[in-house]
Amino acid sequence: GHFWSSDAFADDVRRRGALLEERLARIAAEHGFETRGRGMMRGINVGSGERAGAITAACFDAGLIIETSGAHDEIVKVLAPLVIDDALLSAGLDILETKIREAMADDYAVAAE
């Protein structure tokens, strides 16, 4: 059968979208943030453009290209290809999770000064 007409492809994309949703929801919940979007176009509202910018810059330095969106660029947005390999998607989300944790730790440190 043709690649694009296969149910297996559609099922794979749906499954990957669910995996992405689950990981982002867990990351967001850890910091009291909310997720946005659907399917493979999802993000986390981190509360400010300044914070989102710091997170995306840190991700970029770690090899993950990720961008911001939203009225105030407050959403860190994952735009993974539909055909991304699960291991690669997980590795990217690991980087995102770490960089959000680090950014929040920096925020707490600044607040405590």
Regions found by a protein language model. Give the residues of each.
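Conserved N-terminal phosphate-binding loop of PLP-dependent enzymes in the Aspartate aminotransferase
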Residues: 1-113
